[in-house]
Amino acid sequence: MLEQKEIVRYGLDDATFMIPLRIESADRMRNIITTLIYLCRNFRTNIIVYEIDQESIFKSAVVPQLEQALLPEEFSMITHIFEKSDDYTFHRTRLLNDMAIAAQTKVVVNYDSDIILPQLSYIKAVDFILNGYNAEDGRPPEPVKCVYPYGFGEYQIQCTPTDESVSNFINSNFDFNAFEGQTRKWDAKYGFCQFFDREEYIRLGMENENFISYGYEDDERYMRFNALSNVIRYNGDIMHLEHTRTSNSWFTNPHIEENRSLWEKLRVMSKGKLSEYYDNVEYAKVRRQQALDNGQEQSSTEA
């Protein structure tokens, strides 16, 4: 039984969490419920959940549980977008870009539906982008445009929870000891979540929509922003709630070879060539125009 509890929420009003979603199994449904309750109870922020499927499992099965667990002001932070589609392929990069264009905050967060960070990691990541990185010798803050809030290597805490341990975690105000015996340290590389300055994210091409389904988009994004922007990564842990995998989340998907070829092409480009590619690739030009149009619409509405 999930309980409503009111706890202190930290203000992350300048951030929008972007969560692409397809609920393909019972454990994926449990994961999105857990993640959203964690975000909504701990932070005052903005969340977009973009679901694409034949029917909205989020609306029929997730929302009732969220309404039971969250206070009205917490639940109101979630914007749910549903796109009806019979296409089996999950085009994650396209959904993320749709949400980035719709977002109206300085910071956008590419956020998987099954991850949890320590509270301080969220706060630090947003602060770095808004205020820069303060050098220890007293120099002016260095600009930060992208944050990876977890380390490279054994910083992933893989968790295989049960319904009971998830309920205990939530009802204990998120005591991670609720998962005792259900976790192991594992490899963390480039996925999970990233915090971006929204304008920089759009300028540098956001998610490359030519990566379809699963594979190599995380590697390419990390390479690109390290080459062309200002990135910080710090050695914190990240919890990954495990789940059943279909080909949409594994290397057996039918787009994997095309994704690999694109990654092999981009990874050897010089900074100049990489920048030129993202200045001219068609999807990115369309997205930048959408961002301009969206900004003009917001300005006229505010006026």
Predicted segments, located by residue:
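N-proximal low-complexity "stem/linker" segments adjacent to membrane-targeting elements
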Residues: 1-38
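C-terminal catalytic/acceptor-binding lobe
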Residues: 10-11, 28-31, 188, 210-303
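Cell-envelope/extracellular polymer assembly enzymes that use nucleotide-activated donors
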Residues: 14-18, 46, 220
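A conserved acidic beta->alpha catalytic loop
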Residues: 25, 50-65, 115
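Short beta-strand/loop segment that forms part of the nucleotide-sugar
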Residues: 44-57, 81-85
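Conserved catalytic core of nucleotide-sugar-dependent glycosyltransferases
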Residues: 100, 118-209
